[in-house]
Amino acid sequence: TDQTVDTKTMTVDTYGSVQIPWTGEDIKHVNNGSGFETIYGDQIRQAMRSITNAIELAIWTAAYKGSSRGHGTAGTTPFASSFAELPQLRKILQDNGCPFDGQVSVVMDTTASANLRTLAQLQKANEAGGTELLRQGTMLDLMGLMLKESAQITTHTKGTGTSYQLSAAGSVGDTTINVDTGSGTLLAGDIITVAGTSHKYVANTALSGGVFTIGSPGLRAAEADNDAITIGNNYTPNVAFHRSAIELGIRAPAMPPGGDAAVDMMTV
C-alpha cells in the first residue's frame, strides 16, 4: 500500500570549542610546582565538562520547548511532600501514546531532586526496596520512569502577552492556534490554557502573525471562537520524555580544505 513517511530536518547550528594555549615557558614554570601533566589533565576534564554542559542545555531547551503539555503549578517545586506528580506525568505520556519500555525519563532540576531525596518513603529500605538513594544518593526508577537530574535546568520567562482570544474554533488534535485581540509576546515554551478546559499546552513556536503552534497531539478538547487564552507564569521546566523523542547530531569541526596549522590531532 502507499505510505507517507514523515521526515524532519536536522540542522547543526551550534558550534563549541575550548582553547588550551601553552608555551614552552609556561610548561617550564608549572613544572616547578604541580607539573604540566597534572594541570593539563585537569584542563582537558574541564573542557569536556564545559562542552557537555552546553550540549545538555541545548537538549533541555529543545525538550521543554517541544513538549506537548505541562503539569503542576508554576513557581512551586514538585516533590515537597510526595511523588504524586509522577503518575500524572505518566498519564500525559500514556494519553499521548508514549511506549513504556524502560526508556522513559524524567529530568528535573536540582531543587526538585533535593525534594525527592528527602521523602521518607524513598529513604527507608523496607519501603524503597533498597538503600541506594540513602547511601549513594542514587535516584531509583519510579512508576516506570527513570529519574535524572540536571544543573543546566533554569527558569523559563514567559512572554508579555495578555487578552488574546481564539480567532477561530479549534478541533481536537489541532496544533495550529489562531488568536487575535490581544497584545504582547507569546514565546516558545510558554504554558497556555484555553477558557473552559484545564489542559496546559506548551507553545512550540512564538506567536507570529496571529498564529502559534502547540505540541502534538494538539488540543485535547474542542474550543470555540473567542475563547480566552491565558499565558502561565514563569516556571522551571522539568521534562518527561521517551528516549526516541529527542535526537542529537554531533560531528567534529570541519577541516579547512588546505588543512590547518596543527602538528598533532586526536579524536576522542
For each feature predicted by the language model, list its residue ranges.
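N-terminal "assembly arms/tails" that initiate or stabilize quaternary assembly
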Residues: 1-13
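Short intrinsically disordered coil segments
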Residues: 2-5, 121-126, 164, 265-268
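Short beta-strand segments
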Residues: 8, 18, 199-201
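Long, contiguous amphipathic alpha-helices that act as assembly "spine/axial" helices in icosahedral shell
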Residues: 10-85, 94-112, 137-147
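Short linear interaction motifs
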Residues: 85-88, 175
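Glycine-rich, charged/polar anion/phosphate-binding loops
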Residues: 90-93, 132-134
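Autoprocessing Asn-cyclization modules and mimics
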Residues: 115, 120-228, 232-233
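Glycine- and charge-enriched low-complexity intrinsically disordered segments
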Residues: 213-267
